[in-house]
């Protein structure tokens, strides 16, 4: 019997080629970037009383999104060894060998460079440099140093992740404004309880790879207390836009309800021993931030 030759079909080759981009897309953390871009968009909209000019809106979103994706890719590169040891991240492209280190590095640098050039040439220099500073803050200061150096890593490093509303604001106006900084303060206060809830759930994994997250170094109960205190601090921060006349009653009602919900979930985490509460707090925090900025947007166009 003659041997049968296995010849790859054009269809299978095309399918394989079409899937080649997926690991690179995954390295940009698209869900995280999408939430971040929502806060950028709100920053843009709140910067002007009417409609946002088209060029800074479109190019700004693309450029900031590209540099945020690049920062995420650098995070994948720097954390590739510990990612391979953690259940949450072991299936990422680099630990699994779906992308080589040189290709991942080339991708991250190219994405960052293109995003920077777009912002610098078609938006404004201030936004380009602020976005670059955010990339350095997240990829190098937080991921490469703070994450491994101190249990306060996410508190200090959270500033880089809190910058997007300011980036959106400067994309449109080309200058700093106190109102934009209030939005930064909100995300800065939101970040620790968001990440600490996840860290409680993944405490054993962080301990395994010697990452000094707060639950690992100070214990779960102490971390739960900190989460509760930070949700109260966040609730106060969320009132600041109302106190300075930046927002109206729609935002006041919406933000108050969201703050009460977050405090309740944190209280439940602290004083209830039901399993799975940490991940409930983590998931609620994502919806909290998303809905809070949507309420900001609605209030702006109803109250302006």
Swiss-Prot record:
The domain of life for this entry's organism is Bacteria
Membrane-crossing residues?
32-52, 54-74, 104-124, 126-146, 154-174, 180-200, 226-246, 247-267, 284-304
* InterPro entries from the UniProt entry: Protohaem_IX_farnesylTrfase, UbiA_prenyltransferase, UbiA_prenylTrfase_CS, UbiA_sf
Q: Name one GO cellular component term.
A: plasma membrane
One biological-process term from Gene Ontology?
heme O biosynthetic process
Question: What membrane topology is given?
Answer: Multi-pass membrane protein
Q: Which UniProt keywords apply?
A: Cell inner membrane, Cell membrane, Heme biosynthesis, Membrane, Transferase, Transmembrane, Transmembrane helix
Q: Which reactions are catalysed by this chain? A: heme b + (2E,6E)-farnesyl diphosphate + H2O = Fe(II)-heme o + diphosphate
Pathway listed for it is: Porphyrin-containing compound metabolism; heme O biosynthesis; heme O from protoheme: step 1/1
Q: Name one GO molecular function term.
A: protoheme IX farnesyltransferase activity
Q: Does the keyword Cell inner membrane apply?
A: yes
The record ties this protein, via CDD domains, to:
PT_UbiA_Cox10
Q: Which E.C. number(s) belong to this protein?
A: 2.5.1.141
Localization of this protein: Cell inner membrane
Q: Does the keyword Ion transport apply?
A: no
Function of the molecule: Converts heme B (protoheme IX) to heme O by substitution of the vinyl group on carbon 2 of heme B porphyrin ring with a hydroxyethyl farnesyl side group.
Question: What does the record's miscellaneous section state?
Answer: Carbon 2 of the heme B porphyrin ring is defined according to the Fischer nomenclature.
**Family named by the database record:** Belongs to the UbiA prenyltransferase family. Protoheme IX farnesyltransferase subfamily.
What protein name applies here? Answer: Protoheme IX farnesyltransferase
Give the originating organism: Shewanella sediminis (strain HAW-EB3)
């Amino acid at each position: 019997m003659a041997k049968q030759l296995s010849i790859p079909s054009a269809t299978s080759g095309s399918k394989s080629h079409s899937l080649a981009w997926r690991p690179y897309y995954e390295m940009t953390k698209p869900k995280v970037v999408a939430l971040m871009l929502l806060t950028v968009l709100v920053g843009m909209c709140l910067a002007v009383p009417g409609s946002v000019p088209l060029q800074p809106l479109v190019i700004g979103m693309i450029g900031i999104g590209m540099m945020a994706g690049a920062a995420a890719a650098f995070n994948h590169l720097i954390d590739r060894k510990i990612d391979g040891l953690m259940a949450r991240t072991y299936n990422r492209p680099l630990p699994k060998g779906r992308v080589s280190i040189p290709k991942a590095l080339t991708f991250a640098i190219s994405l960052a460079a293109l995003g920077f050039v777009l912002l610098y040439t078609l938006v404004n220099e201030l936004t380009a440099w602020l976005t670059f500073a955010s990339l350095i803050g997240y990829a190098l200061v937080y991921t490469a140093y703070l994450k491994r150096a101190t249990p306060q890593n996410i508190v200090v490093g959270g500033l880089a992740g809190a910058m997007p509303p300011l980036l959106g604001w400067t994309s449109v106006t080309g200058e700093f404004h106190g109102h934009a900084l209030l939005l930064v303060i909100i995300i800065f206060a939101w970040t620790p309880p968001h990440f600490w809830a996840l860290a409680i759930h993944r405490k054993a994994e962080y301990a395994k790879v010697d990452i000094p997250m707060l639950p690992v170094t100070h214990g779960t109960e102490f971390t739960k207390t900190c989460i509760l205190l930070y949700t109260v601090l966040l609730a106060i921060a969320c009132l600041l836009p109302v106190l300075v006349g930046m927002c109206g009653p729609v935002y006041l009602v919406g933000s108050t309800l969201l703050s009460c919900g977050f405090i309740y979930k944190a209280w439940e985490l602290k004083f209830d021993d039901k399993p799975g509460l940490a991940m409930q707090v983590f998931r609620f925090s994502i919806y909290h931030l998303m809905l809070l900025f949507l309420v900001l947007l609605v209030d702006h166009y109803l109250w302006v």
